[in-house]
Swiss-Prot record:
Residues 92-205 form the Response regulatory domain. SMART domains: REC (SM00448). Keywords: Cytokinin signaling pathway, Phosphoprotein, Transcription, Transcription regulation, Two-component regulatory system. This is Two-component response regulator ORR7. Functions as a response regulator involved in His-to-Asp phosphorelay signal transduction system. Phosphorylation of the Asp residue in the receiver domain activates the ability of the protein to promote the transcription of target genes. Type-A response regulators seem to act as negative regulators of the cytokinin signaling. The gene is RR7. PROSITE patterns: RESPONSE_REGULATORY.
Length: 210
C-alpha cells in the first residue's frame, strides 16, 4: 500500500506539518486521489486524517469465492460419478457343465474378463439357484449333460416368465448342425464349440453384456 510522504511529526495528525497537514479540511500535499483505493482522506472535527476504508464486499474476492464454490460443486459431482462407478457390480454369469475341467476353464475365462461367475455341475442345480437368484446376466451351458441336457435347460428357462429374458449360450464338443439349429430356434443366443477360447468369450460378452 502506498503511504503519502512524511507520516510522522507535525501537529500529531500523522502528516508532516510542513505544508503536508491542514486544519479545517485542508488538502494533503502528497495525496493523489484515486491511486490508492484503500486510503481515503476524512475530516473529523476540523482535522484532516488518513483512514483505511475496508469494503464490505470485494468484487474480486466474491468472484474468487464463487469460482471456488463452482469448483467444489464440480469436485462433488466427480466424486458422485466415481462412487457410482465403484458401486456398479460387474455382470453375473452362470456356467453349467458336468465336467469339472470344462467348468474350471470357462470360469477362468469369464473371471479374466472381470465377470462374476457361479459354476454348477447340472441343469437341475442351475434351476435351483435361478429360483432364488434370478438376476443372472447370462448363462453358458454345456449341451450334453446327464439327467438334463443343455437343450432341456434352455427350454425351461425360456418357458419361465421370470427367467426367459436371460441370454443363454450353448457349448458342445460335437459339431452337429441339426443340434445347433434346434438350440438357436429355441432361443439360444449362440452356440460355441469346445474348447472355448478367449475370443469366443469376448465376442459373446461384448454383444450381450455391454
Amino acid at each position: 500500500m502506498r503511504v503519502p510522504a512524511a507520516v510522522t511529526g507535525g501537529c500529531g495528525c500523522g502528516v508532516d506539518g510542513g505544508g503536508g497537514c491542514c486544519r479545517g479540511g485542508g488538502k494533503l500535499a502528497d495525496w493523489e486521489e484515486g491511486k490508492d483505493d484503500e486510503m481515503k482522506s476524512v475530516v473529523v472535527k476540523g482535522w484532516t486524517r488518513m483512514a483505511q476504508v475496508v469494503p464490505l464486499h470485494d468484487n474480486a474476492s466474491a468472484e474468487d469465492d464463487d469460482d471456488d464454490e463452482e469448483d467444489d460443486d464440480e469436485d462433488d459431482d466427480d466424486d458422485d460419478d466415481e462412487d457410482d462407478e465403484e458401486e456398479a457390480a460387474p455382470p453375473y454369469v452362470m456356467a453349467v457343465d458336468d465336467s469339472s475341467v470344462d467348468r474350471a476353464v470357462i470360469t477362468a475365462l469369464l473371471r479374466r474378463s472381470k465377470y462374476r461367475v457361479t459354476a454348477v455341475d447340472s441343469g437341475k442345480r442351475a434351476l435351483e439357484i435361478l429360483g432364488s437368484e434370478p438376476n443372472v446376466s447370462m448363462i453358458i451351458t454345456d449341451y450334453w449333460m446327464p439327467e438334463m441336457t443343455g437343450y432341456d435347460l434352455l427350454k425351461k428357462i425360456k418357458e419361465s416368465s421370470e427367467l426367459k429374458q436371460i441370454p443363454v449360450v450353448i457349448m458342445s464338443s460335437e459339431n452337429v448342425p441339426t443340434r445347433i439349429s434346434r438350440c438357436l430356434e429355441e432361443g439360444a443366443e449362440d452356440f460355441l464349440l469346445k474348447p472355448v477360447r478367449p475370443a469366443d468369450i469376448s465376442r459373446i460378452t461384448s454383444r450381450m453384456l455391454q
